[in-house]
A protein has these predicted regions:
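Cytosolic regulatory regions built on CNB/CRP/Popeye-like sensor folds
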Residues: 1-153
């Protein structure tokens, strides 16, 4: 069932059935109840998480304000990519916004798989780059809007 779902996810859409099976073999399906902290801000976990069902809230703790939601992710979205690729601490928390299920893919496992399967690696990394480019574009638009608002004050 999750393999059919992954075929609809942009990150995995170009992978063939055998490649998807290989990804699923290194991944772990996890269920998270509403409010569960999947990734705590400032921790390192080295896993990429793909949302299968439910929603995940990405947030930061803002001094004097508390938790500030940055975005809410839905099925097909992924998170944890910063620490997954560069090993740095998480820049934000990921919290189950409602009951959800994720596919968690450990960095070491996918790295080994990509080394062994260059075609899978190329497809995966190209899809990943397209997704990140879209996120960067969205962030630039938000920053432009915030700068325009700040200049009004």
């Amino acid at each position: 069932m999750i393999q059919q779902f992954l075929k609809t996810v942009p990150l995995f859409r170009e992978l063939d059935d055998d490649e998807l099976t290989q990804v699923l073999m290194v991944g772990l399906v996890r269920r998270h109840p509403q409010g569960a902290v999947i990734i705590a801000e400032g921790t390192t976990g080295g896993q990429l998480h793909v949302i299968h069902t439910g929603q995940v809230r990405i947030s930061k703790l803002v001094p004097g304000l508390g938790e500030e939601a940055l975005t809410i992710l839905s099925p097909g979205d992924f998170f944890g990519e910063v620490e997954f690729f560069d090993g740095s601490p998480s820049s934000a928390a990921a919290i189950a916004h409602c009951d959800c299920e994720t596919l968690s893919i450990p960095h070491q496992e996918i790295t080994t798989l990509m080394r062994e399967r260059p075609a899978l690696s190329a497809k995966f990394l190209w899809a990943f780059a397209r997704t990140l480019a879209g996120r960067l574009r969205d962030t630039n638009e938000k920053m432009t809007a915030l700068l325009a608002i700040s200049r009004a004050f």
